[in-house]
Every structure is written in C-alpha cells, then in structure tokens.
Amino acid sequence: MVRVIIKGGVWKNTEDEILKAAISKYGKNQWARISSLLVRKTPKQCKARWYEWLDPSIKKTEWSKEEDEKLLHLAKLMPTQWRTIAPLVGRTANHCLERYQKLLDQAEAQDNQATSSSLGLIGTGEAVPSADDVRRLRPGEIDPDPETKPARPDPIDMDEDEKEMLSEARARLANTQGKKAKRKARERALEQSRRLAMLQKRRELKAAGITIKQKPKKGSVDYNADVPFEKKPLPGFYDTSAETSKSYKAPIGKTLQELNNRNAGPEDATKSKRQREAEEKNKQAKQPIAGPSDEHIRKLKEADQITKRRKLNLPAAQVGQDELEAIVKIGLAGERARFLVQDGSSDATDSLLENYSALDSAKATRTPQLAAHEDSVMREANHLRLISSMQTPLLGDVNVDLQSSKSSGIQTPGSFVPQTPNPLLTPGLRNGQTPASASDSRLHADTSTPQRTPLRDNLGLNVDDSFQAGHETPRELKRARSLAQSHLRQSLSSLPAPKNDFDIVVDEQDVELQANSSSRLDNEPAMSEEDAAERDARLARQAAEEEARSEARRSQVVRRNLPRPAQVDLSRLHNQIDSRYRDRVELLVARETAQLLHHDANVHPIAGGKHPEPEAVQFDTLSDTSLITARELMRKELAEQLGFPGANQEALKRMVAASLNDDEEGMQRLEDALKQQWYEARNNKSQLVEQLEVTRAKMARIASQAAKGEKMLTKVLGGYQARSVALLNSTKEQFKALQEAAISRETFEYLGRGEQCGKADRLDSLRKEVESLARRESMAQTAYKLLAEERSTLQEHCEMLEMELLMRQAESLNEANLSA
C-alpha cells in the first residue's frame, strides 16, 4: 500500500534552516521551487513560515506598555482588522491577536479574583480552568497555526526521510551553476574530444604514408616552425644611452602611487578619468528601478522602531559646578564661624544661633512615596472585554458602566510618569491652575505638599509670601488676611510662658568704665576737701593705669622680652631695604619695621647695649585708638588668611600655635637660628660650651644622616655603577676594535694603490689577448662561410644527380612498358 504523506504539522529546526538557505538562493517569489526541497511542507506553508516567524524584521521581544496601549486603542477603533493593525504596532497579525487575547484574559482573571475575594466565594472544590489551560492543545489535537510557533529541536537520531531530504537539499543548494554554465562546459568537452580525434586520424594517415596538408588558420601560429613571441635584435650595436641615463637611487620619500604614475602623462590621466565616469554610469544603470530592496525596507522598519522608543529627557542643571563650590565654601565658613562663636560665647546667646547645616537636612530628606496609580492597560483591556460581551442595543439592555479614563476615543491612553519633587524649583502656580485653586490648595496644606519649604529659617523670621499669589479680588484678599491673622494667633498661643528668674552678670570692663567715670567725677571741683589717703590712692591708681597704657603702647617684642638686636644702624637698614624691595607696600612695611627696631633699641635698650639719648630717636607715637584699630585690622586679616573670618584673638592664637607645631622643620630652623645668631660676644664661657655641644650634636646627627644617605645611595645606585663599569669596558673594547679597523683600512688602501699601478699593464695584456681572439674568430668565420658555400654546392649537385637518376629510371620503365 502506498504511504500517503499529509503535508503540514510542526516545523523542525532542519526545515527552518533549509527554508532560510533556499530563500537566500531563490528569493521570496519562487515558493514552489523552495517547497520542493521540503517534503512535508507546501508553498503556502513555506511563505507563511517566513512572513510569520523567520523574517529578521519580525519583533519577538517583550511587549512594552506603549505597544499594549496602542494595540488596545487600535483594536477599539478597528475591531478584528489585525492585518491593518499589525504594521501600525510593529508586530505580526498573529502576535497582535495573541497579545490581545492574553490581555483580555488577564483583565478577566483580575475581575474574577476581585469578585471572588469580595464575596468570599472560595470553596474546597476544583478551581475554574484558566484561559491558558483552555487554549492549550490536548493530546490528539493539531495546532492550527504551526507557522507562528518556535521550531522543534532536531533529534539525535534523525529519520531516514529527514536525512534523505537534508542530503538532497544540500546537493541542490550547493549547485551554484546554472544552465548556461553547464552548456558551456559540455561544449568545451565536445571540442576537446573532437580535437583529440582529429589528431589520432592524422597520426594514422601519416603512418600509412598519406600526408594531408593542414590548412593554417587565420591568425594562428605554427609553434613547430616559428618561435612564439620572438623579437629579433636590430642589426648593429645596442644603444645603451637609456641605461646610462637611468637613475638607480632608492626611491626614498616617495609613495607607491607616485612610483606607479611616474611615467603617466596627461593622456593617461584623461583616460583614467573617462574610465571612472564610465564605471559610475554602469553602476547607476545596474541599480534596480522597481522600488527599494527588501533589505532597505527592513532597515527602514528597524529605524522606525528605534524612533518609537522613549528618549531619556533629563531636566537642565539648575545649579552649576561653580555655584556648588561657592555653596560648599559658604557652608564651611558658616560652620567655622559657628564653632568660633560657640567657643567664646555664653549660654544665654546660644539659643539665638541656629544650625543650618546642609548635611543634617540632607540626611532627613527622603523621596516621598508615590501614590499607587491605576494600570491603564488593564483598564482598557477590561473595557474592551465588557464591550465585546455587551448585548445588542435593540434589546434595550443597560449599557456597560465603564470607568472614567483620561483618554478619549481618539487618542492613546496617557501614561503616568513618576517624578521626584524638586525643592530647588522656583515656587509658583502649576500650569493651568487658577487663583481659586491656588487658594483652595492653601486650605488643604495639611494634606498636600506645600509649594515651598522655608530653608534656613529656623527662627521663623522670614515672611511667607506664598499667600499673596493669585489673590486678585477683594474677597480673596480679605480671606487671605483672615487666614494670616488666625495663623498668627495660633503661633502666639503656642509660645512658652515667660520666666523671670534671670541672673545679672557684671563684666569686669563695665566695672573699670564705672571706675574711670568716678575718677573723672573726682577730678571735678568738689564741694568738700578730699582726704589725703584717698588722693594718694587715686594718684597711685592713675599712675598704674598710665603705666598699663604705656606698656600696651610698646611693641610685642619688648613686652614679651623676646630676643632683639642690641644696636641698629638705621641708615644701613634703609639702604638694604631700598635695594631689596620693589613693591611700594612691602617697602613701606620694611621701613616701618626698621624704624620700630631702631626705636626699641634706643628707648628700651637691652643689657650690654648703649644708652643713647631718647631725644635723638625720631618716631611717631600713635594714639591708643589708632593702635586698637590697627590691631583689629591685623586680627581680621589673619583670620581671613587662616579661613576663619570673625575669629577672636584667643582662637587665632590656638590656630597659629597648632600650625607652628605642625611645621617641625620650620621650628627647628627657628631654634637653630636663635641659638646661633642671638648671642653676644660678652657671654660667659658656659654659653660657648653649650654652643659647642649643640654644634657637635648637630655634626653627629648630620654624619649619621650622611651615612644613611650614602648607604641608601649605594643600594639605589649600585646597579647604575655596575652598568657604568660594564659600559666603560665595552667602550674600551670598541675603541680597540676601531683602532684595528683603522689599521686594516690603511693596509687595504696601500694594497689598492698598488693595484692601481699594475692595472694598466693587466689591461694591455687583456686587450691584446682579446684582439688575438677576435682575429682568430674572424678567420674561423671566413673558413666556415667557405665550407658552408661548398656544402650547399655539393647538396645541389647531389639533388641534380638524384633527379637525373630518377629520370633515367622512369625512362627505363617507360621503355619496358612500351616494349611489353
């Protein structure tokens, strides 16, 4: 019984590969020829398989939310028109239908789940089968659309039919030659066999003594008689002028194109230009006219799909890099100022200074949780499911109650884009918000996010002007005013109760000021006579105050009894300052310093110095107010340089001491300078002994450092030293080799001069030998010519004798025939 093959069924991986290879060879129009390679598939099935699954332009990725929304919207506008919807969505019609059914099933499942959970209809019986279980194929059923499903993998042991189909397809697809190529090959084989037959025939006739003269072909060459491609030399001597003028230098600095076009002239350039133009015309003529190719269409589809992707739109930077750095510097300066103020302030004023650190506020800042929004895809799918199950309007039934949606019937449902609130955004009204809505939003301030968060206002000093936006009518203004008053009453009612248990602390400066004022009152003429003891005490107090003020007017060096020179030559210092400083400000500062040194050395001399007359010293004495102002300016300048503007004197002392303690090297240099420079020749012997010990300790320390440095350098530079010795030995060997080469060169030069002297004699002898050989060759050529002429004469004579012999034999034969 003949086996009947029913074409169709599940596609296998082997069949897919054969189909793709056949389409690459035969194209997408010869489906009958393509299906002839597949035993179990028809042309229609092959075409459907390609356009539903194997086409590279088919999109098989996961469905995005935008694609789902577009699919549901188009299904509402064009129900059951999947061939029209498919190119708009960018998927195949079958994929669109499957996705549509899946979305409806999901919406129905959610609806059923919500209904059952609300009514509590959960029993112990079997659950209702899902949509996937209903659509899943049962045993014995046949898939109606196998072309849209993935291929079945190949088994390890294939059937004989599949192996035969695969081998036949491989053989047919490997045959890349067409009918014309086969015909040409067949004609070449026939021509070769005909030529061999003719050669065999001539060979046999020649062996039989029959010579057939072959007619030469036109334009052919007889390789037995002629030398192919022979070029006979011209008579005479060869012209070598072209060789002597030819340059044999290496083509250094020239490109390959210059070398190839070295002999090209203007005619060659014109010819190449015409050839390029002809090639361009041929390419344009060979291009297809009937529309773009399939590859071009596929690229356009991919570009269309790429353009449909959502772009990443980020807002522009509201604060630049420079502004961020400035904000950081301001914050650090504020923190330092707060630290300095807290260091010297009292507890009574601590409550007036708030902490505006951005780090603490950033730690507490969190992105607010977004409210759960409804899934628009499921909502639209549920709408379509209800619409599809709705009865005809002729029955008069109630319409389906659809949920409110942002989308109308003519646009795709909008999507919700979650955004992080921006606290740096300028506060104001929303787009399209009316003043009334703005005022209403103020009423619900406890449930909504305010328009602006007051920054750096912990004491509530700034006035909130957010109420003034949008109040245009008198009614709104009155309403806003009443709200502000009620808010103020609530704020005042929340204030703590007043406290009266305060302690009065009197500062010592206030006591001194009070004493000064009392002393000024004492200076006025009194009504009664002053007591002598009180007068003496007042005078002593005034003298002490004047002494304190005089002590304050002295320089820091004198007050602290710091080392200073015993004698100062002011004119010499001025000359050195004028020659060293060019800047006017530095020059003035240096001159003032020299003047102050000279004043201190003369007015407040040290032990061992001279005591000149104070009247000879010219120095402008400043007032107490000027000194206080100058010291305050110095304090501010030093605080700004240290990065702590507004710091007090004690804080500056601590910071300067800390910086000097960190600079150990500078302190060591200062101590060494003080130990070496600030001493007098009249010091006692113990000081010199101490200085000697210090110097010896310094020498020992320097010697140990030098030994360590030498050891370290030996370790570091040992390799370099060994390398230097090796290079020195190599240099000596090379120099020796150079000397030997120079001696060899001189030797060969001497031999060359000797060869130059004997070259002429050898050339003469060789020339004579060549001349004798030439004479002998000419004589031999003459003898050869005579012998060749004699040989030709003898050959002609022999031929004549042979002809005469043949004639006599022919005559004898004729006579014999006649006599017979």
From Swiss-Prot:
Residue span(s) of domain HTH myb-type: 3-58, 59-108
Coiled coil: 160-205, 526-562, 761-805
One GO CC annotation: post-mRNA release spliceosomal complex
Gene3D superfamilies: Homeodomain-like
Ranges of compositional bias, category Basic and acidic residues: 132-155, 268-283, 534-554
Pfam families in alphabetical order: Myb_Cef (PF11831), Myb_DNA-bind_6 (PF13921)
GO molecular function: DNA binding
Annotated keywords: Coiled coil, Cytoplasm, DNA-binding, mRNA processing, mRNA splicing, Nucleus, Repeat, Spliceosome
Biased composition regions of type Polar residues, renumbered to the chain: 405-423, 431-452
Cellular compartment(s): Cytoplasm; Nucleus
GO process annotations (BP): mRNA cis splicing, via spliceosome; mRNA splicing, via spliceosome
Residue ranges the UniProt entry marks as DNA-binding: 31-54, 82-104
Record SMART domains: SANT
Disordered, as annotated region: 114-162, 248-294, 405-476, 514-560
PANTHER family: CELL DIVISION CYCLE 5-LIKE PROTEIN (PTHR45885:SF1)
Subunit details: Associated with the spliceosome.
Family of the protein in this entry: Belongs to the CEF1 family.
The protein's name: Pre-mRNA-splicing factor CEF1
